[in-house]
Amino acid sequence: MAEIIGVVERIWRYPVKSTGGERLDSVDVDERGLAGDRLYAVRDAAGKLGSGKNTRRFRRMDGLLRLSARLGRRIDGPELFDPLGRPVERPNAFLRAYLQLDDVELAREDAVSHFDQLPVSVLSTATLEWFGEAAPFTVVDERRFRPNILLRTPPGTPPFVEDAWLGRQARGEAPDSARLSFVASSERCSMTGAPQPGLPHAPEILKAIVHAHDGRLDALAEVAAPGRLRVGDRLTLD
């Protein structure tokens, strides 16, 4: 029997990797993920993508989280906004001055995926609200964890309920709803506590996740069947 796990409370898309995103009422979902999500990134001359960490694929570029981006109805290119929310007219020139790096540009995804791990992140309100006890003096907001879907879970749902979804599939009730296949949890890094508009530096957030849940948070999914997701959708597990 299908199990209702919650209601889609918010949908987030991040047109430019590692910058702030945009809230949506609904979104198309294809095999790659949410349409337009992380479709662009700040890329350097070596092909590394701007991020909050240094890895084989990524280059740490402090300050990206203070920026934001949106596509709106467009997929042909993002609008970039500075830390005060003002639109940026010449993104590449702005990024080079803002980051103090002369080899970066805003680039569309090509052969190298812009996703850290898997394309869709789902976070429960039960887990988000747990931080009220785990980090009571910290400003906690889902933007720190950059989910695509914030799912309103029933009262009494335990934190880290996302673990119970792994290995299963979920979809909304509408005939055209996308189907998600939950695979793993995100391994969190210092970006969870990085400052961004309205959210101060908070390193204790990552410490709480490491202590309570081995540094993992959310449920990451692949797209099992394309379709649409909407705020207010009830998601059921198969």
Language model segments and positions:
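Metal-cofactor-dependent catalytic cores
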Residues: 1-238
